Amino acid sequence: MVQNIIQEIDRIAQAQPDFPAFDELGTIHSYGDLYHYSNALAAWLDQQNLPANSPILIYGDHQFEMMASFIGCLKAGHAYIPVETDSALPRVKSILTTAAPQMVLAVDDFPADELDFTGTVVNHDQLVDLLHQEVDYQLDHFVDGDDL
């Protein structure tokens, strides 16, 4: 029985790195891709001086970068808040006010000006560059159990 999804994803990635993890409109992304991209993001997040366990808003749709960002945030010890691009601005504003994330990972264009968001916004191009970094990441402080 799976005890922790992060550890299970990493186990599959190491045992079968080419096994399909995500099909994005016919583009197949493997568990190896998910492992490497999420590790790269987690390593970068660890260097950002974010408060421990602080949530990170991830803005996008159904792209692979969303999944990699979810896992990367969890590996770095941060909860993630997924927000779809078709969400109404008042709803997004409410989420920002309630959860108070200091960072947004914008898989799609994030309307920071319209929302008066003053935290860090990592745009799509920056995020893709981060995800493609080669890192040696040690999974030692991920979100687990009741951490959320």
Regions found by a protein language model. Name each.
Residues 1-148:
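Carrier-protein-dependent adenylate-forming modules in NRPS/ANL systems
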